[in-house]
Amino acid sequence: MLWSKRQQRFFNAWQGVFLRIGRIFGKDDYMEFQIQVLDKNSKARLGVIKTAHGEIPTPIFMPVGTVGSVKGVHQRELSDDINARIILGNTYHLYLRPGTDILERAGGLHRFIGWDRPILTDSGGYQVYSLSATRKIKEEGVKFKSHIDGSSHIFSPESVMGIERSIGADIIMAFDECTPYPCEYSYARASMEMTHRWLDRCVSYLAEHPEKYGYPQSLFPIVQGSTYRDLRRISAEKIASVGADGNAIGGLSVGEPHEVMYEMVDLVCGILPSDRPRYLMGVGTPANILENIALGIDMMDCVMPTRNARNGMLFTAEGTINIKNRKWADDFSPIDLAGYTWVDTAYTKAYLRHLFAADEFLGKQIASVHNLGFYLWLVEQAREHIKAGDFSVWKDMMVRKLDTRL
């Protein structure tokens, strides 16, 4: 049920009252990051992020719910079976549909989608980057055409922060430009400097426009600089100087070799504050996730587990399975005996292959639940091995297996 604006103001007022009462009695709902264990043989760390909507153990993988839904997966499956601790929404897509008016009347994205755990929203910079043929970038912001109906829109740092206030995510990303790969040095530097100026405007806007729903939102600025070490260093130093609740690394996993990505991540993590969470945007394969955890990354997201699932690729601890292959047609063993989620032991490989062959959407749903369950299991295991002190040995063993084609 959508709320009237009067009802929404009433709700916001009382939620703010309860928030203040909680602080009086020692319950601070502002985001907090605690490091619990530092790995002795890598830069991996075990920690927890505390938000108004719950705690997030780190390292963590965040399923992507671009338009307010993780494709093919119910919220109950996400929370109870997959055990996602935080999900993503996207400012660009949510702005176009359903729009900020609907979201505000619903009481924010949490209430609109029925999700009571933390949410992070991307600023839409990557989506605008992907619309290279229909957008123009200037100092004021980005003019682009909707992929839905071709209508023209303008994103500026101020308008994007306003949209993210209306969405109401716990963690909101600063507006930035994601550069392509390869990218000329001159363009990468100019883009990075503009991203820094946009960040200053984001910070100013948020300081003058408080949260709408009675709980705090934490801004994460984004390090850019393409694959140039000097630019990444300059950007990381700028981002570190802001003193934000957390920091992100963007502009990677856009086509550069994995070794280059790891080099940039290692460089930037050595500059960003160690007492704040580090979020690597848009990454990646299971092996990418483990390697970046070893470099000091705490948070990652990617559409890969669900996108690949819809194409019949399953990730497992022993390697990847293309369930469409004929070899699985009469394999009546469970999808995965490891049982990351209930679907893994409820259905057989032969049945799942049949669903894909028959183009039944249920097959894509089952594969999506499995892959997300595996990704969340993988980071849970990473946390356990950091705690146990053998993360590096376990990581090297897992990476060798993860790239195997079964």
Predicted feature residues:
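Short, positively charged and aromatic/hydrophobic N-terminal segments
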Residues: 20-27
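Conserved, mostly hydrophobic/aromatic
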Residues: 54, 87, 122, 164, ...
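Glycine-rich phosphate/ribose-binding loops and adjacent secondary-structure elements
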Residues: 193, 205, 209, 217-335
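Non-catalytic, usually N-terminal nucleic-acid engagement modules in DNA/RNA processing proteins
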Residues: 31-212, 326-329
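C-terminal extensions of enzymes
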Residues: 31-48, 56-62, 71-72, 176-182, ...
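N-terminal amphipathic/hydrophobic targeting modules at extreme N-termini
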Residues: 1-8, 14
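Glycine- and acidic
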Residues: 181-184, 189, 246-252, 361-364
